[in-house]
Amino acid sequence: VGHSKFQCAVCFAGLLLLIIGLRAQEMPTPEKIIEDMRVANQYLMNKWPDPTVPTVKDKVRPSNIWTRAAYYEGLMALYRVDPQETYYDYAVQWGEGHNWEPAYGGTRTTDADNQCCGQTYIELYQIDPKPERIEKIKATIDRMVNSDENDAWSWIDALQMAMPIFAKLGAIYQDNRYFEKLYSLYYFTKTQHGDNGLYNPEDHLWWRDKDFDPPYTSPNGEDTYWSRGNGWVLTALARVLDVMPEDAPHREEYVTTFKDMAEALIPIQREDGFWNVSLHDPEEFGGKETSGTGFFVFGLAWGVNHGLLTDEIYKIAAIKGWNGLVNDALHENGFLGYVQSTGKQPSDGQPLSYDKPANFEDYGLGAFLLAGSEMFVLAGGSVQSSIEGRHIDLTAPERL
């Protein structure tokens, strides 16, 4: 009898795990996805009713630094699938408040972090082509296009901060010089920064910067592939491919690397849908982390939606990741837990928890909104053509 009871217990436990697993892979409705995105977004908009107010932490920073710029990428993605004027007005007020300039350094800055806000400036220009919205970020990038230096992106986060800007300008102005410079900067990061580049062609993942390429290893002897860093890269590739013409130079390089990265992410996804902060070492501060996971869900869902990732495993992984974020990280009031604070490696901001806020609450939300926007499409949601049209080339002002 005892043996029979044990078998029943095992069967019940197995059935429970199966039910949990199926729930994790159950596609939410488009309406539920929008609802969760709205709640998360409203939390930040309530906290920052004036989007131009500086961020005050250990020092005062303008509100168009990279952390907030990443949020606005997500907000514009939300606007695409849930076109409320409140979102558009909030973004325009932000851009106008910063005079449509980079965060620091004016048009002379080559720092990708300073330039990241330009992604949203350009998207707002594409909705309403007022020249002031694009002039300064274009002048900033034009200086880099006309320079012979290609080593500006020495950390992989930079790829997401700046690559889409070059791609957007190349598409708007139909000028391949932006695509060529984009490739030169990207390829230097991939193959030359550090000892042999920051990309491992065997594992199809990236070291965050030269401090983490071999011989550096995690405490358990593994390569340290930081989750959010790789999330930045996957997001960069998706956002570049999203606007690049099919015949743009070097497009195939980005497609190949995107697919290789996506394939590498599948076997290391956690059962709860998240990815560990150290992708190859679950013992190095292992646990749920929202920002990297959000970027991965965005990339995977985007790849499925655009026909680059055709195997069912990618769709399942995206659903599993999104459900993990919503079920385990999103609070009823819109706060997102398990967001790792700013940094460059798995140990930064540890330990993480459901209730612990990151030092900046904006970029994690940006990842969540980007992910949700593609999950909305994956779930069968329809996007209004008038909003989709902002990706279409408009009459451009003066060329490069």
Where does each model-flagged region fall?
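Residue-level detector of functionally pivotal "anchor" positions at catalytic/ligand-binding pockets or at interdomain
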Residues: S385-L400
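Bacterial N-terminal signal peptides that target proteins for export
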Residues: V1-C11
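Bacterial N-terminal signal peptides
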Residues: V10-I19
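Extended ligand-binding clefts on enzyme/binding-domain cores
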Residues: I156-D157, A167-L279, G286-V297, L309-G343, ...
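Asp-box/WD-like beta-propeller blade repeats and closely related beta-sheet repeat scaffolds
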Residues: R133-F166
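CBM-like carbohydrate-recognition segments
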Residues: M27-A69, V81-G118, L124-D128, E132-I137, ...
